[in-house]
Amino acid sequence: VNVYQQPMLPSLCPSPDRVARPVTVALVQMRWLRDPTRHRQQLEEGVARAADAGAEVVFLPELTLSRYPADQYPTGRADALAESLETGPTVAFLRELATRCDLHVHGSLFEATDAPDGRGFNTAVMVDNTGALVAKTRKTHIPVTAGYWEDHYFAQGPADNAYPVHQLELDSGSLPVGLPTCWDEWFPEVARAYGLGGAALLCYPTAIGSEPDYPDFDTAPLWQQTIVGHAITNGLFMVVPNRWGSEGLIQFYGSSFIVDPFGRLLGRAPRDESCVLVATLDIAQRHDWLTLFPFFKTRRPDSYGQLVAPVTSNNRGIPVPSPLDRSDDQAPA
């Protein structure tokens, strides 16, 4: 497993009173291997290499131990693939890695529920270096399109406290993080909620690749640009671990990356390689950037009502203003 490491970059607009806050983080990009022992071994090697490189936190891809199931509809009950959050194999595996390597380890799983339809939650978790489960966040937005039929497997995460900020207690200090998942990364509202909540870093564990209905359309550049934009407009570091390789109908394209609040890529993985990205972040750069460009201070929440209004669509599926706000000349086609 190759390791690609980025030392800390200087701030582009250092505040006069700034105090640097370095923290080293890592992600592991992997492919799903049918043999569960070999699959775990590649993750174990990646986490160990991250620890050897000085990482205090390592982030793993979506549905860490399993094949991506949603390229097709379930043939039986969806919960045949689900597991207990507290006592299932994923958290047990993360506990083992975290205590052995003495660092915080993030992962993701298909969390079982008692829902009659068999759907569970797509849940991100964090285990600290003592093996304690210190954070969990359920995926809020669920994709519904060809090759990513997740609505047949996962329920939407609860709206109440949907975007919690977790304080990780590291040797370098406290690190406030958010743990949304994959499809959440396309929604600017999610990054903004975390930014307003005081997060300094978001991890989006991801499973993204080809589009079965449009095999020649490479969405990787759009995916990266979207998340880089969220980083800039919310003053956030972003850690985005993806998988690679062919699984069913999807060719996952890797390209995992880490980005800072200035939009600088601190590392990007190849499309077709299991590897580790390591980067030392200066958390104080969030304060630097948001002091120069005070997005939160100059917001206009009183003008944002339409953002939380139900969506009305015309017969082409394009959103139009809600009936209360629409003038006669804006009526749906």
Regions found by a protein language model. Name each.
Residues 2-57, 203:
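N-terminal active-site segment of His-dependent metallophosphoesterases
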Residues 25, 126-134, 259-267:
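Short, glycine-anchored, charge-dense loop/turn motifs used at functional sites
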Residues 2-13, 229, 237-333:
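C-terminal beta-strand edge segments of enzyme domains
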Residues 31, 61, 140, 205, ...:
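Conserved residues at the C-terminal ends of beta-strands
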Residues 107-109, 122-126, 164-166, 256-258, ...:
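Short beta-strand scaffold segments in enzyme catalytic cores
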Residues 86-106, 176, 182-276:
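CN hydrolase (nitrilase-like) catalytic-core segments centered on the catalytic cysteine
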Residues 36, 45-130, 134-136, 145, ...:
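Cys-nucleophile CN-hydrolase/nitrilase-fold catalytic domain and related Cys-dependent amidase chemistry
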Residues 3-12, 83, 96, 114-225, ...:
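Active-site catalytic loop in hydrolytic enzyme cores
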